[in-house]
Amino acid sequence: METLLLDGETLTLEQVRAVATGAARAALAPAARERVRRSRALVDARLEDGEAHYGINTGFGTLAEVRIPRADLERLQRNLVLSHAAGVGAPLPLPEARALVLLRANVLAKGVSGIRERTLDLLLAMLERGVVPVVPERGSVGASGDLAPLAHLALVLIGDGEAFLAPPGAAGRPERLPGGEALRRAGLEPVVLQPKEGLALVNGTQAMAAVGTLALLRAERLAALADLAGAMTLEGLLGSHRPFAPEIQAARGQPGQIAAAAHLRALLAGSELNASHQGPGCHKVQDPYSLRCMPQVHGAARDGIGFCRGVLAREVNAATDNPLVFPDTGEIVSGGNFHGQPVALALDVLAVAASHLAAISERRVEQLVNPSLSGLPPFLAPQHGLNSGFMIAQVTSAALVSENKVLCHPASVDSIPSSAGREDHVSMGMTAALKARQVVENVRTCLAIELLVAAQALDLRAPLRPAQRVAEAHARLRERVPHLSEDRALHRDIEAVSSLVDEGGLEL
């Protein structure tokens, strides 16, 4: 198994996924360890200068003017973690929680947060030994960072809170245990937080970035899958390949459109079905937009998803603590890097971009099941009337598309003041992340429905064969789901194709 060396500078989104899914380990890079030592030394030195330093020897938020006696500084950090662990709702799924731990460790490795080596080492040891904090999803407004989610992570470090014990490679369901018990079972000891450490752990954008990164990577795969689903539908509807010609795309110059059209051309190459309806015998002049404009719509989605990638690729290596500790200049400086606006905006874009992959997919399903549009039996049903075929599969897709329209209302346009007005503009970045995650989940299901219905249409076009890559995808799908010869409970078929998608079984 690969071991990633965290330095706060070079972590990639794909590496985040690898650690989140247990496919890679993480350790602290030697150079990063030295930076951590130096930043901690500066914090310790500042404790002796008699000055007020925010979050080190003062209260927090609107209580920043309150000086804390030296004897109470450890208690101050513990109280910060305890008081901020006010999250509610379902726990983050294990991959997202592991990504959260990884991202917090990575940004601490930058050496500008004043954390001790021991505390950072415990964070990484928790990842290594499968101690995954129970982190409620809700309760963050995205500035001052994701306070509540990160506080629940920090609880486990001090032997409090709850954690799942899920060692990498272990069989069975993870155990949910008190945090101290999970550490003990893993052979680890909690830490007593020193000045600045509680703040270094809870102040940052890593919860929204963790959820957003995994949603983004899934959306990127679905953007390619949307081309495959569209190609399969196009073949089933005897649609034209001509709108995907490179000269059309070049005349506009949008990069996502050019990439989507190239992918569609590759998927559709060598189609017997296409050859069968060329020439004078074909009465179609133009296909509906949901077929003809796939490069434009899928391409715009790719571009929006790409924008989100750029923001998150920077954010996973970003110092979002406050104050920041700069050993080279000897300064400890308060700022606003904890504000999640860049991530919130990007995740809203991700949700909107991905939603269009489902919206156009549902319209293609309508083309397939409507006999006046497809020339095929109503709802692709054998003995229609007695059988309803894929009638309600299309309704399910429509329901998810409409749900996405609600979810795509941007979280990042909202703000609500907190902390007695000191924190008077916030990002709602975690809300954007959770919404984007659900939108992407709905897109996956809509594309699975389209693939299921399009496969039936291809069956009905036999013996003519579709393009080779479409035929290969059809064959893989048929290994999981048989042809619909009479009505059956379609939810099982939808789940089977969805699982095939999640496993990457249709990535050609």
UniProtKB/Swiss-Prot annotation:
One Gene Ontology term from the biological process aspect of the record: L-histidine catabolic process to glutamate and formamide
Enzyme class at the top of the EC tree: lyase
Assigned keywords, A-Z: Cytoplasm, Histidine metabolism, Lyase
GO CC, one annotated term: cytoplasm
Location within or outside the cell: Cytoplasm
Modified residues (2,3-didehydroalanine (Ser)): 144
EC number of the protein: 4.3.1.3
Cross-link 5-imidazolinone (Ala-Gly), where in sequence: 143-145
Protein name: Histidine ammonia-lyase
